[in-house]
Amino acid sequence: MFDLSNKTVFITGIGSGIGLATAQVALKIGATVYGTVFSEEQSETITGYIPSECIYKVDVKNSDEITFAVDDAAKCSGKLDGIVAVAGILSLQEFTKTDDAIWHNVIDTNLSGSFYSARAAIPHLQKQAAASIVFVSSQIGLVGHPLGAAYAASKAGINGLTKSTAVELAPNSIRVNAVAPGPVVSDMTAKARADEKRYNSLLADIPMGRFGQPEEIATIINFLLSEASSFITGQVIVADGGFTAH
């Protein structure tokens, strides 16, 4: 198993799903973890895993809030070795019914929030001999999906952000990668899983015949944070049970 001993990692969206699983795996392999939630209720839920002083209630659409949280975490820990931008939202509706408010909320949360998080972290990451940024994309950022224009655009944007930033930061020994999950068992997919017809339709498109588990995606993310992936940068790693392979 790869190791994050003596590493400090900041993770957005640790209140549930992939973010929570990423924090749990990171803690298990030795990391000190700081992270963001969007509600007090989420904060209370995860205090059993992470001390309350390491949890920040943040709106990732607000660059000032995320910058303060990252700076404060780096100050408290004395350093920052990696950041993972997980926080995101899913909104599905017809293209012509995607109004300005929906569009901006999805783009600002998923894409701008990821950008703000990385931008806040880079000055701290540059102080380390080696550091890592991991974004969370989606298979929907790689293939078409009906009703998902805003979400697909936000995730495709993350793919471009990953590659451009990786090339720019490579001379600073900062690696930048993304993970693109397929459907995962989480709050985000709860509605789809509750609809038997829709759920079975989704399963039919996944050669492995199941949704992924948050821990499976979290393991890939932590691999990318670790020195076990020291020659990997600029990659969008797809974990979708074979969906995009056919």
Task: Show which residues each predicted segment covers.
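Active-site helix of classical SDR
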Residues: 118, 154, 162
